[in-house]
UniProtKB/Swiss-Prot annotation:
This is Sulfite reductase [NADPH] hemoprotein beta-component. NCBIfam families: CysI (TIGR02041), PRK13504.1 (NF010029). Pathway: Sulfur metabolism; hydrogen sulfide biosynthesis; hydrogen sulfide from sulfite (NADPH route): step 1/1. InterPro entries: CysI (IPR011786), NiRdtase/SiRdtase_haem-b_fer (IPR005117), Nit/Sulf_reduc_fer-like_dom_sf (IPR036136), NO2/SO3_Rdtase_4Fe4S_dom (IPR006067), NO2/SO3_Rdtase_4Fe4S_prot (IPR045169), NO2/SO3_Rdtase_4Fe4S_sf (IPR045854), NO2/SO3_Rdtase_FeS/sirohaem_BS (IPR006066). [4Fe-4S] cluster binds at C439, C445, C485, C489. One of its GO terms (biological process) is cysteine biosynthetic process. Disulfide bonds: none annotated. PROSITE patterns: NIR_SIR (PS00365).
Amino acid sequence: MSEQIAVKTILSGTELGPLADNERLKRESKNLRGTIVEDLQDRITGGFTNDNFQLIRFHGMYQQDDRDIRAERAKQKLEPLHNVMLRARMPGGIITPKQWLAIDKFAEENTSYGSLRLTTRQTFQFHGVLKPNIKLMHQTLNSIGIDSIATAGDVNRNVLCTTNPVESELHQEAYEWAKKISEHLLPKTRAYAEIWLDGEKLETTDEEPILGSNYLPRKFKTTVVIPPQNDVDVHANDLNFIAIANNGKLVGFNVLVGGGLAMTHGDTATYPRRADDFGFVPLEKTLEVAAAVVTTQRDWGNRSNRKNAKTKYTLDRVGVDVFKAEVEKRAGIQFEASRPYELTERGDRIGWVDGIDGKHHLALFIENGRLLDYPGKPLKTGVAEIAKIHQGDFRMTANQNLIVAGVPAEQKDQIEQIAREHGLIDDGHSEQRKNSMACVAFPTCPLAMAEAERFLPEFVTEIEGVLKKHNLPEDDNIIFRVTGCPNGCGRAMLAEIGLIGKAPGRYNFHLGGNRSGTRVPKMYKENITDRQILSEIDELVGRWATERQENEGFGDFTIRAGIVDEVKVSKRDFYA
């Protein structure tokens, strides 16, 4: 069978089976409208019904409930306490002080938890918004120039961009491209404006030239990266543009395609995967290449089995070279050889950083991205107080931290004082804590199998104790991440130690990632308790402290010492 016929057979669906029900849902949704308006008017239930439960994701929301009280409500013959989580669309994570004060006020007055959550998608989330407040939420955001279009669902989601503040023209150029890519790949339907902003209902076909009438087979994630920083974790994303500069000016991008971390417990046809390097493209071809990758995945992705619908599986099914050739054909280009670059670090530089324009930037470590007023540490109030006087902007990072960017010299002391008074600067935070993160998980995430955000702080304290026990200096820390389920939001599958929730109090224990985020870790122990994990870490760190080579990271040591095998090709090696 020729390559062309083989590809056509794959695309026709004859090898992939009947379409998943989500494809019917999207096709019948009237371009993402469904019957969401009718559901909003239904006060009998606090949730969304039938297809609308899925459709609201395309509008940036997930239906959730408080799982801590789910059983008690069931005893009382009550439905779960339904609410929504909203994820804002903020390409590059930049938000103004005026916008910040507005979202702070909304979170305080109209959410069940009174918090703001910075996320690994370089944006913020509201948690615990009840149905009567949903429309107000969207209208509040719209009034300050923010929306949540396409931050969830089978579309291109919030575009990430390296967040270190404007230290060069290159950073600003990269951010501008992140915005352009985001706008270019957005859904064109007017459903969002009609439903949430009371927009005029126009007679229109709502054609989707890039996403198509059935949108994408699965979610799609895009980044813009400035080497050597890999804060956005390129290998967690479907499409990555690696900025290539000449004399400090952006000249184009190396394009990496097919990364992704989600998998399904017990299903060896699912796995985390590094992205493949397609080559270099000049700036003027950036949007054409972005659209070509998206439309190729749109047409070739698996619409039968959603567990195998991501771009990474399409590449492994049809072949990287075949996929790349189709992208070249659609974009009208030939990829050039990749330009040299190196990714060496992922962490945010916490503290003050000087910009080239005489301004200063303060990166604040926000553990797990949760901004809340804790006893003795009113973090959320602290950021709001800074916003009241700040003349620059804020930058949310993909590590769930916050940068106060563009601070003039005369305001440095005042802003630092506010930050310290509210616990936003804590000199007691170790490097280990700064290099650890978790997804939300319980009590709000419906997919969580184990704790993550609530589990991480105390467990990191215990890891700190292990490092101290083995006389390791502060700089010798471990990239440690926890996710409550195998869907990958906490990016644990690019950590030196990654814990994946399996059941309450139990995790799959992965080892062997590296500090730069360019290697997938391998499972070391399955379904073990946190106490067992800590015991294993104690033993392994002891070996690392005594057996390592000079400047050898923990993940590199576990590979060299034969504790786990290196994952080079995920499809072949991850479960081997």
